[in-house]
Amino acid sequence: ASGEDSCDELTEPDKKAGRYWKGPVWAVTLAIVAIAMSLATSVIPPMQRSAAKVQPISSGRTLVCPPSQGKASLAAGSSGGSLQVGTSVEKLSEASVPVMTNVDTSAGYIRSTAGQRRPSGSALSSEGGMTAWVPCIGAATGGAVSVTNPSTSDLVVVNSDIRAATVDVTMLGPKGEIVTAGMRGIRVSPGQTKVLPMSVWDNGATPVTALVNAREGRVVVGARMWAGQGHDTSAMTQAAKTLFLPAVPAKVSTATLIISNPGTRRLSVSVTALAGRGPFTPDGADEIDIDPRSTVQVDLSKALAGEGVGLRLSADDPVIARLFVQGKPGTCLLYTSPSPRDLST
């Protein structure tokens, strides 16, 4: 990837893509915030993109962090007193919460015991002096990830189950669904990770959303966006009629919202900013029309007026949303919507 990835499309002066913070203090702080929020809401050849092997998991409350290209640390929390964490189901160890442990380039596993509430966690990876964060998620039969530049992005599909998975990929772009060869019947063996360069299907530089559906088995899906300074990894989310995106820090330089309509009819999406002075509708975001099977990009930089806010999206049918926010030079924060299972929709 190059410096034109992710954040460069949001603002020209910043040449660093991804969601990065310098220094261990920011990394640890972000991990703590991620855990608290989760508990509160209950062309690059494939061989050059190494992917860590993951081990099968058994039934239970288990979360998996997609493997990172850089050395990663796993941060986990729970309302209970302890969790099991590790790099495979055979190597889980009991630890008191909150817990931080090194997983390097392996997938990270978090598991709660019977009777405990759902655990939460994140993986923090370092590469080239930069730190990136990705939440740990549960395996599912499908999910969606959005990227700003598919030409420099990968899909990472993890089969953490004990049987093979077969997945289909569908990409939604600004002009509708992208149809090309090689997107159907992709087999992922048990305990394996498959890296799929998105540039094979779309070598453009406009936002797209990839829908991954497992015909057989369950998978964990992430998106890896490449840049000159390293990479950023995001985890899959689900479509919903109502989506809440985490707080946007005050005085950010850019805020760009990516919304996709996976349905078959045209939708109108309304956006509400939740601020300390009360909710308001950002200019130009009261009704965002999206054609079927397509993706739109909305610039909210001026509309948010530099306030620290959260965002609520509402539509008559399920939509997918992701927010790309850039703060001070060299910093890009990427927020995604929680899974609908954690929301009241």
Regions found by a protein language model. Give the residues of each.
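Edge beta-strands of extracellular beta-sandwich domains
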Residues: 115-132, 218-227, 318-329
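Short, aromatic- and glycine-rich surface loops/edge beta-strands on solvent-exposed regions
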Residues: 106-116, 207-214, 308-316
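Terminal targeting segments of Actinobacterial cell-envelope proteins
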Residues: 1-22
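Extracytoplasmic low-complexity, Pro/Thr/Ser/Ala/Gly-rich segments
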Residues: 41-117, 252
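Surface-exposed interaction/gating patches
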Residues: 143-163, 238-280, 341
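Conserved small/polar residues in nucleotide/adenosyl-binding loops
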Residues: 335-342
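Intrinsically disordered, low-complexity Pro/Gly/Ser/Thr-rich segments with frequent PxxP/GP/PP motifs
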Residues: 90-99, 178-203, 281-306
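Hydrophobic membrane-insertion alpha-helices, especially the h-region
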Residues: 25-42
